[in-house]
Curated annotation (Swiss-Prot):
Region spans: Disordered: 1-26
Name this protein carries in UniProt: Protein YsdD
Domain of life per record: Bacteria
Gene this chain is encoded by: ysdD
Induction and repression of expression: Expressed during stationary phase (at protein level).
Amino acid sequence: MTIDKNWLNRSNKDPGRSLRFTHQPV
């Protein structure tokens, strides 16, 4: 679940890219 937090943090800079990763099952 640590990766999910990393993507959320990146969403601040790339909301489009973060959304793509969050949609994928971890």
